[in-house]
UniProtKB/Swiss-Prot annotation:
Residues 37-256 form the ABC transporter domain. It comes from the Bacteria. One of its GO terms (molecular function) is ATP binding. May form an ATP-driven O-antigen export apparatus, in association with RfbA. This is O-antigen export system ATP-binding protein RfbB. InterPro entries: AAA+_ATPase (IPR003593), ABC_transporter-like_ATP-bd (IPR003439), ABC_transpr_TagH-like (IPR015860), Bact_Polysacc_Export_ATP-bd (IPR050683), P-loop_NTPase (IPR027417), Wzt_C (IPR029439). Pfam families: ABC_tran, Wzt_C. Coiled coil: none annotated. ATP binds at residues 69-76. PROSITE patterns: ABC_TRANSPORTER_2. It comes from Myxococcus xanthus. GO terms for biological process: polysaccharide transport. GO terms for cellular component: plasma membrane.
Length: 437
């Protein structure tokens, strides 16, 4: 039988849970009998909460897939089905490969065992032999950077230490599939960069990554595909920039309609967000943007940079028809969607005499100057017949505490005024200071 090209396959998967009684206990034979004697017996359907109502989703091998959706839409339930923590109420679920997961903080760790002992236990649970875990023990400990704390009980660990240990174990057991639920922020800036580099290494090795997050910029920056869970169903799967754009539009429509944001599982019919009218989504024009990348000065992929660094935005496109009036736009956005800067070839009088097919658009920024935070760059090809766009997200990390969104080039000078007296003299090797008074 040929090996499947898909890592995860879900067909008509339903997951339901029993409601709790008023006392906070699950319904039992006794509680149902008492309800029946009081004339308050519930139907089977009334005693259930259905989180997933028929999930159909295929995740190809080697792809990074971002799962998005409102709180309560079933994203975490879906991951727990994939990892085997839950079993489907009905439907088929197929997993092809070894899974490692980063779910609830500290899940799978025994609080009274040391970090070293928990590494051994978790490695065995994830399918490794004792000898394999011991062979990788030093590498896992070194990556976690826990030092002498590795031999202390994990109940003494901070949340950041928990996350470091969990990430180190999950990424060093050689999984085929890595599952992550909202825990990419693993520790300080240094460890976050290290973790991102490890994730990039996973992608280069062709591993499958499934990520649940509310950070849409992370999905746009990291993922090959996005899947939107809404009302207990998969509402859309596709290009991350397109799926997140429709999701944002649906959220905006719900807010405009003053729709109640009740958890979908507690809402009759699943509480799906409003449908986005097709006219709200621009038609695709003659120039199609296929991929947008962020590169550094060496031409290498860029995820994190400092305010003083430059960057290059590179967009691959194809021409599908006459495009005499095409106009390329580049827009810098903050994490909350605010436009910080936008320009276009037309506004800068850039002549587009002949369009190559396929072609590459390059937008070079010598120095970005943005302060620390999450940003995205959107490249659009606009024409009278429609528009095509792509997005790449990135993070700026700054060691300096500053306010605002932009750092202009500047320097500080302290000089004597026209009528000033002799100033403070600085001896070589001493720290200069200005005294007032």
């Amino acid at each position: 039988m040929p090996e499947s090209m898909d890592a995860i396959i879900l067909k008509d998967v339903v997951k339901s849970f029993r409601k709790r009684t008023i006392r906070g206990e699950y319904t039992t034979f006794k509680s149902e009998l008492l309800r029946w004697l009081r004339g308050k017996r519930q139907s089977r359907d009334a005693s259930l909460i259905t989180a997933l109502r028929g999930i159909n989703l295929t995740i190809p091998k080697g792809k990074t897939v971002g799962i998005i959706g409102r709180n309560g839409s079933g994203k975490s339930t879906l991951l727990k089905l994939i990892t085997g923590i839950y079993t489907p109420t009905s439907g088929d679920l197929q997993i092809n490969g070894r899974i490692s997961a980063l779910l609830d903080l500290g899940a799978g760790f025994h609080p009274d065992f040391s970090g070293r002992e928990n590494i051994l236990i978790n490695g065995i649970i994830l399918g490794m032999t004792r000898a394999e875990v011991r062979a990788r023990m030093d590498e896992i400990i070194a990556f976690s950077e826990l030092g002498e704390f590795i031999d202390e009980p994990v109940r003494t660990y901070s949340s950041g230490m928990y996350m470091r240990l969990a990430f180190a174990v999950a990424t060093h057991v050689d999984p085929d599939i890595l599952i992550i639920d909202e825990i990419l922020a693993v520790g300080d800036e240094h460890f976050s960069k290290k973790s991102l580099a490890k994730m990039m290494d996973f992608k280069r090795q062709g591993k499958t990554i499934v990520l649940v997050t509310h950070e849409l910029g992370t999905v746009e920056r990291w993922c090959d595909l996005a899947a939107w869970i809404d009302g207990g169903y998969v509402r859309r799967v596709g290009k991350p920039s397109e799926v997140t754009a429709e999701y944002r539009e649906a959220i905006s429509l719900a807010e405009a309609q003053s729709a109640a944001f009740t958890p979908p599982a507690l809402t009759e019919g699943g509480g799906a967000l409003p449908q986005v009218p097709s006219e709200s989504l621009p038609a695709e024009g003659p120039v199609r943007i296929h991929r947008v990348q962020l590169l550094d000065a060496r031409g290498e992929s860029l995820e994190v940079l400092s305010p003083e660094e430059g960057l290059e935005v590179r967009a691959d496109f194809s021409v599908e028809g006459p495009c005499e009036d095409v106009d390329f736009h580049v827009r810098l956005q903050a994490a909350d969607g605010r436009t910080l800067y936008e320009t276009s070839t037309r506004s800068e009088a850039v002549v587009l005499s002949r369009m190559p097919n396929p072609g590459v658009l390059r937008f070079v920024v010598e120095r970005l100057g943005a302060l620390g935070g999450d940003y995205s760059l959107v490249v659009s090809a606009r024409a009278s017949k429609g528009e095509s766009s792509g997005r790449c997200a990135f993070r700026v990390v700054s060691a300096t505490e500053e306010e605002g969104v932009f750092r202009p080039p500047h320097r500080w000078l302290v000089e004597p005024g026209a009528n000033s007296q002799a100033g403070v003299r600085f001896e070589p090797g001493t720290s200069p200071r200005v005294e007032v008074g």
